[in-house]
């Protein structure tokens, strides 16, 4: 992943002026850079293709100077984005068909890593991202819910839920763990769904999000509460430091979760933070 973004085709006058100010390079080399255009050919597998260790990802056929000048850009783009796409694919595989949303921008190592990483995560199988810049620039689905601060900014949880449902009538996913998931959050969400049903304003897509606690236990209890209240179509989304191992464990415990928001551990590939691609 990242092969489509690798090649810089020229150096600007400002670039040349800066390089000259370093007093490292001679004038002949700087003049060469001023007129530089990559003339070689690059052969690459399509982005998103599964590859195995020691299998070439990309081949550069060019004069040695041109091939050398693009080395760092190629490795930077391919190593980082292939790392995140690989992590995303592992998370997606663990979820066994449930949707995985990329939620990692706040914990990414900088804005570029957050945006390129979100793009790579979608290539790796995520259904969308909470990174709106990435969604805009690369035409991928923008997805997400609201934050705990939304709830806390209102006088009470029920009022916050009602207002959110009013503002987002087609996709109402309510974050239920701000105060007490089973005694407050889920009951208040059910009450809002009942009110919407009575007013004939049920959203096309609706549900709750769990963001803390024992997700297996809470999801099973919440599922029963929603079903008993007459809302079997309500979806349950889970987040909270998820990765492929935790998702696999939760599913093996019978967790009633329909989709997953995965942030830190995906966007940083926390357990394997570097991809060892080389250029030879």
Which sequence ranges carry the predicted segments?
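Segments forming glycine/polar-rich beta-alpha architectures that bind adenosine-containing cofactors
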Residues: 42
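Hydrophobic residues within beta-strands of alpha/beta enzymes
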Residues: 143, 208, 236, 258-260
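Compositionally biased, intrinsically disordered terminal targeting/sorting segments
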Residues: 8-13
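Short, small-residue-biased leader/transition segments that mark boundaries at the very start
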Residues: 2-7
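Buried, small/hydrophobic-residue-enriched core segments of structured protein domains
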Residues: 24, 30-39, 48-52, 57-229, ...
């Amino acid at each position: 992943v990242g092969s489509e973004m690798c090649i810089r085709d020229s150096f600007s006058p400002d670039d040349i002026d800066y390089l000259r100010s370093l007093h490292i390079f001679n004038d002949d080399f700087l003049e060469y850079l001023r007129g530089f255009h990559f003339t070689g050919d690059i052969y690459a597998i399509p982005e998103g293709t599964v590859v195995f260790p020691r299998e070439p990802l990309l081949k550069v056929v060019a004069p040695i100077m041109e091939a050398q000048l693009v080395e760092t850009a190629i490795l930077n783009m391919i190593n980082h984005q292939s790392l995140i796409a690989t992590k995303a694919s592992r998370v997606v595989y663990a979820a066994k068909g449930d949707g995985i949303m990329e939620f990692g921008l706040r914990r990414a190592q900088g804005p570029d890593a957050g945006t390129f990483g979100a793009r790579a995560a979608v290539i790796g199988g995520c259904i969308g991202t909470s990174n709106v810049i990435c969604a805009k620039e690369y035409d991928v689905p923008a997805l997400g819910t609201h934050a705990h601060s939304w709830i806390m900014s209102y006088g009470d949880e029920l009022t916050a839920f009602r207002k959110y449902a009013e503002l987002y009538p087609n996709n109402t996913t309510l974050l239920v763990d701000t105060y007490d998931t089973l005694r407050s959050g889920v009951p208040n969400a059910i009450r809002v769904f009942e009110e919407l049903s009575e007013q004939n304003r049920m959203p096309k897509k609706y549900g709750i999000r769990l963001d803390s606690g024992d997700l297996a236990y809470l999801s099973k209890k919440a599922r029963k509460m929603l079903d008993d209240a007459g809302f079997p179509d309500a979806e349950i989304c889970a987040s909270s430091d998820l990765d492929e191992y935790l998702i696999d464990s939760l599913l093996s415990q019978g967790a009633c979760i329909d989709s997953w928001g995965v942030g830190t551990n995906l966007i940083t590939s926390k357990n394997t933070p570097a991809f060892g691609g080389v250029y030879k």
